[in-house]
Amino acid sequence: MSTTTPIVDFVRRYAQSGTSRLHMPGHKGQSLLGFEPWDITEIKGADELYGADGIIAQSEANATRLFGTVHTYYSTEGSSQCIRAMLCLALQAAPAAGQRPVLLAARNAHKALLYAAALLDFDIQWLWPAPQDAGALCSCPVSAAKLTGALQGLAQQGKRPFGVYITSPDYLGGVQDIAALAEVCKDFGVPLLVDNAHGAYLRFLPQGGQHPIALGAAMCCDSGHKTLPVVTGGAYLHLGKNAPIQDEAAVRNALALFGSTSPSYLILQSLDKCNQVLSEGYPLRLLQCCGHLTRLRRELNEAAAAKHCPGPLALESEPLKVTLDAAALGMTGTELAEALRCAKVECEYADPRYVVLMFTPANPPQDFERLTSAVLHIVENLTGPFPLPEKNDRELLELEHELHTCCSIRQAVFAPQEQVPTEQAVGRICAMPTVSCPPAIPIVVSGEKITPAAVRLMQKYHVMQAAVLRKTI
């Protein structure tokens, strides 16, 4: 059954009414780029995002039903806003402990987590990948056993984290066992918070059981704009039945704390219209897209195997990503990305080893064919053999062993700082996380000492400048 679009309908009626726009925004609905007639502000009847009781509330109710959550809230400032609000809510709900609040988090977190820690002033204890899993900056598999051990270790120190924070799917398409981690969190009475920015579509796979809320997460964020037909900036904050705070006013206040007082009605209309798309056959189109990608990966891997490539080319990943191991072709990820670019294929992300390509049902058949043709052309012209490098990232392992925290994240972020060349940063204290976006995953965290391994890793990922404290704390 098709879902209503109350925000879109209101704005279209207003745009067609001929009303004199003696209110913001300044373009007055006159077309410059084409969208201006539908760009409005909080006029009468338009509702208000952080105090919604009209058309926005109706639209969010539609999204809540579609995502199967206790309550779904809109964000016009991406998952970054939702991450900060989610952490704020978990912090508010945590029992008073008489000590600094601590979050247990997988190390491959987006830098939005660090900004939240700086603004909310909490500490982070990191979950690092096991040595055999330390293959890339973007990945940090966390097993139920590892999480249990970390929570037990904190308990022995008299500490109880206000939340466990996991990124899934990660930038390379890796997926955590959310159901198992949720059970561990339940046993310890700690909410599981999931950065599901790359996985909004998971709800609409068969049975909808792969979405974090369905798997037991207390709260999660989804970037609608990453994998659903939503314009950039459109995102969701989802609350599950285990969310520590369910009060609507508290949630909207947390979102308002980190959001603009002028949310984009263009983005709100996009989120609203997306509800209708999701209700009109989207799951079938999604399933067909995933099937095409399964066949695409198989074809690429069969071609690579026929040329005796030293390892799989298309890695196992979440359904809508194609993650290519360029080392299987004797190339770097950036070299492979450039070769694809010459074939009119633009990737989402490339690093020294991997190339990530993101598909959705909105991609036409030409896109699948073009990628397949471009990669097969490269495979057919290989002149190997060549060795496959180890998957373990030595610098990442050394980074954990050399870790030394000198001050809190908040102290570092708000302290006087300066930029220095990366090679001159050894021994200095990291101020702001320095890493490109994508993937926006910090190599060194604010407040940590920059070590030789950190410098090597920054250089590997082409980070040439580091923000450091001017003085030692």
Show which residues each predicted segment covers.
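Conserved PLP-enzyme active-site core in the AAT-like
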Residues: 4-12, 78-310
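Short, glycine-/Ser/Thr-/acidic-enriched flexible segments
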Residues: 29, 171, 225-227, 242-244, ...
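Conserved N-terminal alpha-helix of the aminotransferase class I/II PLP-enzyme fold
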Residues: 36-81
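Short active-site oxyanion
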Residues: 70-72, 99-103, 443
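Terminal helix/beta-alpha structural elements that buttress the NAD(P)+-binding lobe
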Residues: 465, 470-472
